[in-house]
Amino acid sequence: MEFNRVRIRLLSSALMTMAAGSLAAQGPPVPAVLSYPANVRAAGLSGAGVAMIGYAGSVFNNPSGLAPIRALSLEMTLARLPDRSTYVMGAAAFRIRQFNLGGGYQYLRLPKDSRVHDNLTGVGTAVYRRGGIAVGTSAKYVSVEDSAGVVTRSATTDVGATVALFEIAALALSVHNLGNLSLSNGGLDLPQSWHLGFSFNLLDSFSNGRLLTTIETAWAEGERHRTVVGLEAGAVLKGLGLVVRVGHGAQPGDVAGTLSKTSYGGSVVAGGARFDYAYQKRSLLGNGVHLFGVRWTP
């Protein structure tokens, strides 16, 4: 009798230990949307975006990247993914004296049979600019809802700094997910990452030609550092034109090294509007992904 009691206690203890180990192994969920390209331009450059400044979508890549916006900027991205998921992004920014303010959201809706129902990210950004130097910060809200309707939420911050030489070049540094405040259900796993980038206009931006290059290196928790190089080339005449782009390097979240190293894209220019397109053969979004977007900066 006593032996049976001891055996039952040992078995119960073992089961509790295994259950605790299983829960620890699962850990808090990592939002997939954080590794997705924030906008179509960055998608066409294999994720390089920290030094591609001047548009509303910078609220996700580099908060200080809003500084060149003189009045207003609006941006939107849409992708219908091969697994029937839908990814959308919207952002807006404007200037008040030496400050730029902006905000945006990323939303990923997965198929009905997925264990995860959706991912949502919302940011609010403030930037201070003096001369060619800008510093900015973003407050970021992230949530993941599973198929049972359980929502896990966290809050974090991004910071960034940019040094710009007129419209010729820009050197930018951004840190994503600095700190992690759990808001519900134990919070999310938000890996911190550092991004250092440089962009350079090889042609006068006021000429009819467009030729810009960028390079970016990123260091993220749990991943090897990656370096991406990108090139944009095109022509604009009387406000109308075409720009094509290509990016080469490891994509964000490519831990196994199975994603495409090269991405492609382009933009139709019509005054202050840019109609963007990007193609990624193999990415976290899926295989053969087409992304569409629009930017308007009057």
Tell where the protein language model's regions lie, with residue ranges.
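Bacterial N-terminal signal peptides that target proteins for export
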Residues: 2-14
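N-terminal, post-signal peptide beta-strand-biased segments of exported outer-membrane/organellar beta-barrel
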Residues: 22-98, 179, 271, 278, ...
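Flexible, solvent-exposed coil segments and beta strand-coil junctions
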Residues: 40, 69-72, 101-106, 136-141, ...
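Transmembrane beta-strands of outer-membrane beta-barrel pores
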Residues: 49-52, 78-82, 96-98, 105-111, ...
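Outer membrane beta-barrel transmembrane domains
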Residues: 56, 168-171, 186-298
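Outer-membrane beta-barrel proteins
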Residues: 85-87, 101, 110-114, 135, ...
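Transmembrane beta-barrel wall of Gram-negative outer-membrane proteins
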Residues: 86-175
